[in-house]
Every structure is written in C-alpha cells, then in structure tokens.
C-alpha cells in the first residue's frame, strides 16, 4: 500500500512494515514458536525463508520455472502451487488416514516444504537430515514432487498424487522421529513399507494396481496392508 506514504505490504493474513522489518499484528501461530517475536518475518531469516501465513506445509514455486518465480513475486499462486494444493486436497478426500497425516504435518512445529523435482529422471524424493533421522529427532523435510508425470523412473505408470502420498508418509515419519533404518528379513526398509502401505490406500481410490515391491524386492506379504 503506497498511498499517502504508508508503504505497508499486504501478505493476506497480515500487513508488513518494511521500514521496521516487522508485521503490524501478531502471528496467529505464535504459540508454536515461543522463542521468537510474534511480529517477526520468516523466522528472522528473510533471505532463506518465506512467510506463508504460518502454515507448516510450504508449497514452493517450481525452482526451475522462471515464470513461476515472477508470479510468486507478485503474490500469485503458480501453476505448480495450484496443482499441489489440489493434490493435497484430493488426498484428504481419498483416505481418512492420509488426511490425518497431512493435517498433522500442517499442524507441526516443523516446516515441511513441497517443491518440484530437480531431475525428473530420479523421480520424487524426500530430503531429510540423516543424522537427526538416525537419532530419532523430529525434523522438517523437503519433498521434491513432480505432479505432471504419470511415469516413474522404473517405468511404472501411476496417478501422480499416489507418489505424493508416499513422500508425505516419509515426511510424517521424519516429523515423528521414526525415520530410522530398520529393515525386513529381505532387506526392505520399514520406512518404505509404511510409505508403500500409505500409497496403496490412494491406489485403491485411483484404480492403480496395488504396489507390492520396493525396487526389485518383494515386500513381505505379512507387512502389506
């Protein structure tokens, strides 16, 4: 708002005074961050963080898309952001358990970010701090998700949001501090078994075939839901 020299930025939920480097009202999620001022911007790191009204799932613009970056600077949702928001909303409708996973991530004290994959040949993945994961420490994550392709690196065809549900299970495990490295008798990580069970809930809704393998290894039938 440049009228009459006020020069405040409208962020939707709050207005920001650039001269002070502070919002003019308190953060509605202030109770989640007792160590910080309720008027601060981006966790006091405006270079590395973006304020998104306090939500704990952050959908970032496609890092490879110049148009996406331009739109985000002017306060618009980009094509990628709109698509991911729609996928998250549909996942909530698809299955109650998956809906609870998403809701708990949204309510988490950790920040869970969803952004576009950097290399489509490698497919979706979830980035975590491996040291924290090994120690069972709760943490935030970055999910790299491609909502535009139905073909996995393995060659399998499936609905894109099936892959998102898989990665969100990893985010949930990281958030809960349960992203440890236990394996099945034939060497499949239990975190992957949980993620496969989660995505199979969505496959039932999309009509995609039930997944029973991780890579070339069969998941023990007794562990499949």
Set out the residue ranges of the language-model regions:
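Residue-level detector of alpha-helix boundaries and kinks
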Residues: 1, 26-27, 153, 187
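Catalytic toxin/effector domains delivered as secreted proteins or via bacterial secretion systems
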Residues: 68-74, 80-225
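Short turn/helix-capping motifs enriched in Asx and small/polar residues
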Residues: 3-7, 12-14, 18-64
